């Protein structure tokens, strides 16, 4: 009996974690518990160093199970409040999800970096800058922008305008001549002027004034008409003289050439006429033969009459 009391008083031996029973039976708490994140503080440090990661494209770091007894993190790291990048609180017991997440504006300062998703949304800290920039862009119309971009071209145009003015002001430029108006005379005026010109080639000042008054013309018009008419008259005289000289020279060059050849019909007539022509008598005729005293040619007369 005392032995049985001693056996009942002794506490049962603790089961070792490496026993068959403990290995076969898996702990539900350990299986359901998510692994601890070792690199979460490193990720926060990277975010603080201006490495902005989008919530949808964050890099996933491997999470390793490390014994907490040997490699235990300090308490201020384990008990820190969750940030906008990770909505879980670190504690000694593991990860416990929190439903209440603090506002980003409380955690993010004015100089904290913003992720790619936050860049798309308007910055609530600097609303004045955006409003001022929008007002400046609206105040500048498209015409003003075009004018600002085309300043060098306007400078070139101004230079070309100044060069054009200099050319106008230069003394070497010849003044443009005004086109003279041509006076149109009536038939009666032309007839009177022609008849006066046939009588007298040159007019005195008094005669020119009287003729201009009778024809209702100015003295200058009458004077110019007489000048042009005299020039025309001189050209006509020169042309007539040249034509007369040419005709006289052509008459002097004419030479009479005798006809040396006739047609067959006229050849017989020419032959008969030639036969009828009398033969001219010789200049020296002797009625009697002349004899020489030479013994060889004594019997040969020198000339015989025909």
Curated annotation (Swiss-Prot):
PROSITE patterns: HOMEOBOX_1, HOMEOBOX_2. Its main location: nucleus. Residues 178-237 bind DNA. Residues 95-181 are annotated as: Disordered. Residues 117-143, 153-174 have a biased composition (Basic and acidic residues). CDD domains: homeodomain. SMART domains: HOX. GO terms for molecular function: DNA-binding transcription factor activity, RNA polymerase II-specific; RNA polymerase II transcription regulatory region sequence-specific DNA binding. It is found in: Nucleus. InterPro entries: HD, HD_metazoa, HMX_Homeobox_TF, Homeobox_CS, Homeodomain-like_sf. Keywords: Developmental protein, Differentiation, DNA-binding, Homeobox, Neurogenesis, Nucleus, Transcription, Transcription regulation. GO terms for biological process: cell differentiation; nervous system development; regulation of transcription by RNA polymerase II. GO terms for cellular component: nucleus. Transcription factor involved in specification of neuronal cell types and which is required for inner ear and hypothalamus development. Binds to the 5'-CAAGTG-3' core sequence. May act as a stage-specific inhibitor of anf1 in the anterior neural plate during the development. PANTHER family: HOMEOBOX PROTEIN HMX (PTHR46110), HOMEOBOX PROTEIN HMX3 (PTHR46110:SF2). Belongs to the HMX homeobox family. This is Homeobox protein HMX3. It comes from Xenopus laevis.
């Amino acid at each position: 009996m005392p032995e049985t009391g001693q056996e009942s008083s002794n506490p049962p031996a603790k089961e070792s974690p490496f026993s068959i029973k403990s290995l076969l039976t898996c702990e539900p708490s350990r299986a359901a518990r998510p692994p601890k994140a070792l690199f979460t503080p490193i990720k926060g440090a990277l975010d603080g160093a201006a490495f902005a990661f989008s919530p949808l494209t964050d890099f996933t770091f491997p999470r390793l199970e490390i014994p907490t007894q040997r490699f235990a993190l300090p308490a201020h790291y384990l008990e820190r409040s969750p940030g906008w990048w990770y909505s879980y609180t670190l504690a000694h017991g593991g990860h416990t999800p929190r439903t209440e997440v603090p506002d980003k504006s409380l955690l993010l300062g004015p100089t904290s970096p913003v992720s790619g998703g936050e860049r798309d949304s308007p910055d609530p800290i600097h609303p004045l800058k955006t409003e001022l920039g929008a007002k400046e862009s609206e105040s500048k119309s498209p015409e003003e922008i075009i004018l600002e971009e085309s300043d060098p071209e306007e400078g070139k145009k101004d230079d070309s305008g100044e060069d054009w003015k200099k050319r106008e002001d230069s003394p070497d430029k010849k003044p443009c001549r005004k086109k003279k108006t041509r006076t149109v005379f009536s038939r009666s005026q032309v007839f009177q002027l022609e008849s006066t010109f046939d009588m007298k080639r040159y007019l005195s000042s008094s005669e020119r004034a009287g003729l201009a008054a009778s024809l209702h013309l100015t003295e200058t018009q009458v004077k110019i008409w007489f000048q042009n008419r005299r020039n025309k008259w001189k050209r006509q005289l020169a042309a007539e003289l040249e034509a007369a000289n040419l005709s006289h020279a052509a008459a002097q060059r004419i030479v009479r050439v005798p006809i040396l050849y006739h047609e067959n019909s006229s050849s017989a007539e020419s032959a008969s006429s030639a036969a009828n022509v009398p033969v001219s008598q010789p200049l020296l005729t002797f009625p009697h033969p002349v004899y020489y005293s030479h013994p060889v040619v004594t019997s040969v007369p020198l000339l015989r009459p025909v």
